[in-house]
Each structure stands twice: as structure tokens, then as C-alpha cells.
Amino acid sequence: MEARVILIATTNKHKIEEINEVLQSCGYRVEPAAASKLEVQSNRLEDVAAYAAIQAYLALQRPVIVEDAGLFVEALGGFPGPYSSYVFKTIGIRGLLKLLEDVENRRAYFKSVIALAHSGGVEVFTGTVHGVIAEKPRGDRGFGYDPVFIPEGSSKTFAEMETQEKNKFSHRGKAARELCRWLRQYGPPR
């Protein structure tokens, strides 16, 4: 049986690969949509993803998902949180590590939100993984903060893991599994 396609409003090949690796288990796959991702500024990832998904649905007139994620560092009061992408583009991993110089508490968590917009409304799925920020970058896989995030239960950073291994731990993998459960229960969105 051929996998059913759901559009995703991203061109990030790493996100697409990670989400597809999970969705294949429920007979779906995502393909990038030719829609610009409009973001609203909010302290809540759920609001950002839901707004962007609704805008993409209105533009495409087809079911579409948007994934947004953030890294929340305990010692920095949850920073960069929903602004993780902007912070990564401006100060990068080096800047984050500089902020954590001489900081003992390196606990952090990644949160992923997948919003599915369809004719019946918007569904929001979340996944969270707790871990710590490494002292220095390790690994060459993945993207973003993957080289410095070590999930609980592992000694490797996300950037040292293959996609399949990363999805066992990852916030995005957990959110995608929630989406899969919804798709199994309710069938293909319209």
C-alpha cells in the first residue's frame, strides 16, 4: 500500500526526514509544501505552530502540518525557548555555550509542536525530551542545537545519532508519534 501524503510547510530536509521516519509506521509521509510559513511572535510554541498551520491551510486549501521546536535551558530561565531559531541564526551554538560558561546547571529540554490544519480545524501534538547541554559540540548529524544536546538516557548528543536512534529520544519523534496515533484513530484529514 502506498503511503498517504500530508503536506508540511517546511523545506528543512532534516525535519522532513525525522517526521517521515515515524509516519511510515502509520502509512503516511510528508512532502514539502510550496507555502511560506508565516509566524506569529508568541511565548508558546503551540500558538506559533497553530497560527502558521492555519495560514498554510488557507493558502493551500489542503491539509498541512507545521512543526516548530524550541530549546529551553533551565539556567537561562527557559531561553531561547520559542526564539530558538532566531537565537541560533544570530549567536549560534558558540553564543549559547558562552552564556553557559561556568554555569553548573546545564539541564535543558527540547519541545516540538506539530500542528495539523485541516477542514475540521487544527490539531496540536507535542513532544518533549529532557537532557543536558554538552560542554562543547559533538557529532555532525542533525541540525540546530543537536551537537550540544544530550538526551536523558544517552551519553551521545543528537548530532552523534542516526535518525532512527534520535527518534527514540527526540521531541520531534514523540510529537510525530502523537500525530500518527491521531491519524490511526481519525483517518486521513480533509
Curated annotation (Swiss-Prot):
Biological function: Pyrophosphatase that catalyzes the hydrolysis of nucleoside triphosphates to their monophosphate derivatives, with a high preference for the non-canonical purine nucleotides XTP (xanthosine triphosphate), dITP (deoxyinosine triphosphate) and ITP. Seems to function as a house-cleaning enzyme that removes non-canonical purine nucleotides from the nucleotide pool, thus preventing their incorporation into DNA/RNA and avoiding chromosomal lesions.
EC number: 3.6.1.66
Gene3D superfamilies: 3.90.950.10
Classification of source organism: Archaea, Thermoproteota, Thermoprotei, Desulfurococcales, Pyrodictiaceae
Classification via PANTHER family: INOSINE TRIPHOSPHATE PYROPHOSPHATASE, INOSINE TRIPHOSPHATE PYROPHOSPHATASE/HAM1 PROTEIN
UniProt-recorded name of the protein: dITP/XTP pyrophosphatase
Sections of the chain in a coiled coil: none
Gene Ontology MF terms in the entry: dITP diphosphatase activity; ITP diphosphatase activity; metal ion binding; nucleotide binding; ribonucleoside triphosphate phosphatase activity; XTP diphosphatase activity
HAMAP family: Non_canon_purine_NTPase
InterPro entries: dITP/XTP_pyrophosphatase (IPR020922), ITPase-like_fam (IPR029001), RdgB/HAM1 (IPR002637)
A single GO cellular-component term on record: cytoplasm
Family in the record: Belongs to the HAM1 NTPase family.
Source species: Hyperthermus butylicus (strain DSM 5456 / JCM 9403 / PLM1-5)
Cofactor: Mg(2+)
